[in-house]
């Protein structure tokens, strides 16, 4: 038997407004890529998003990632329209996000791994 382990990963998307095109999304993704953020600019239907895997969410979590996307997007004349947490995050990661930003960032206690484990018991 072989068992592998990795640190937690948070899948997170920033959807851009209707003015944004795929070139904008790809430019933003390239600009924010780092050892902590894997990012792609994607076309989903008729909208574009910056799709991210936050591989060190205790260093760069949804709050920091969305801020980076917003800064680069604004320089290109587009805006982040909404944010999307894909799956769950840990309470440790959630605790680093200011309470007043959580709704905008699509995060809440009921979207944590710990909450889901608790309600199953």
Where is each model-derived feature located?
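Long, contiguous binding/interaction regions
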Residues: 1-121
